[in-house]
């Protein structure tokens, strides 16, 4: 659990996720502000259904993505690469996620975009502050953690 704890701690301090979706051989990427749920190991985002990435995702889709800072030196690079699944939330699940999202980003109260969950199934965290090229791996289904 130390690996997931370190990853979760870092993700909780960031706020923008990039993810890519594929449909019929076409790729598209998008960015959004996110709320990270450490217990579910998931991001919550808002995005309109009319967007290209939402249209390509449909109600749920496999995705890959990144979260990274913008350091000016290589020694301070930290970032996450992940794969998982995006799905549009409905009903009570959506309402609960939206309340939490609005607490993190109060301006979102003005938006009517649906709430989506990005469930992370594999995470690779690079943290050069622990040594150049230091990587930590977390896999949801195997319970595997590698440092």
Swiss-Prot record:
Listed InterPro entries: Split_barrel_FMN-bd, UPF0306
Superkingdom of the source species: Bacteria
Family membership: Belongs to the UPF0306 family.
HAMAP family for this protein: UPF0306 (MF_00764)
NCBIfam families: PRK03467.1
Protein's name according to its UniProt entry: UPF0306 protein YhbP
Classification of source organism: Bacteria, Pseudomonadati, Pseudomonadota, Gammaproteobacteria, Enterobacterales
């Amino acid at each position: 659990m130390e690996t997931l704890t370190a990853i979760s701690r870092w993700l909780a301090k960031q706020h923008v996720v990039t993810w890519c979706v594929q449909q019929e051989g076409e790729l598209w990427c998008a960015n959004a502000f996110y709320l990270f749920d450490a217990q579910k190991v998931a991001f919550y985002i808002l995005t309109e259904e009319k967007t290209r990435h939402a249209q390509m995702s449909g109600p749920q889709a496999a995705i890959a993505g990144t979260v990274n800072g913008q350091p000016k030196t290589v020694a301070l690079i930290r970032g996450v690469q992940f794969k998982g699944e995006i799905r549009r939330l409905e009903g009570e699940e959506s309402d609960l996620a939206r309340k939490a999202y609005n607490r993190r980003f109060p301006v979102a109260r003005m938006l009517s975009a649906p709430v989506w969950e990005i469930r992370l199934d594999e995470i690779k965290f690079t943290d050069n502050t622990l040594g150049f090229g230091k990587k930590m791996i977390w896999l949801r289904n195997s319970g595997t953690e590698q440092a």
